[in-house]
Amino acid sequence: MTSVNNNMTSRRNLVLREIKRQILWAWTDPKSYRMSVGAIHALRTAFECYMNIIMTDCAIMAAHGKRKTITDRDIAFHQYIKPFYLPRY
């Protein structure tokens, strides 16, 4: 059980590290700046809220299609219609 939790934690950290790297690359050389713990925590919180909204929308789409499982079609459709409606966030 512990190895499963450690594996999930390391995957989460890899995703967060990739997001942080992309944000720093967008503005400047990432090696010249560092992020504080509070900034990383805020970034993680914002990312989790964003993903929660996407998954909730996809669950509604799956329920509309009389399914209980979110498929890649739901996520692709969400990305397609995202520019056409005002975001809730």
Curated annotation (Swiss-Prot):
GO annotations of cellular component type: nucleus
Gene3D superfamilies named in the record: Histone, subunit A
SUPFAM superfamilies listed in its UniProt record: Histone-fold
InterPro entries in the cross-refs: Histone-fold, Histone_H2A/H2B/H3
Superkingdom: Eukaryota
Species this chain originates from: Dictyostelium discoideum (Social amoeba)
GO MF annotations in UniProt: DNA binding; protein heterodimerization activity
Protein name: Histone H3.v2
Family membership noted in the UniProt record: Belongs to the histone H3 family.
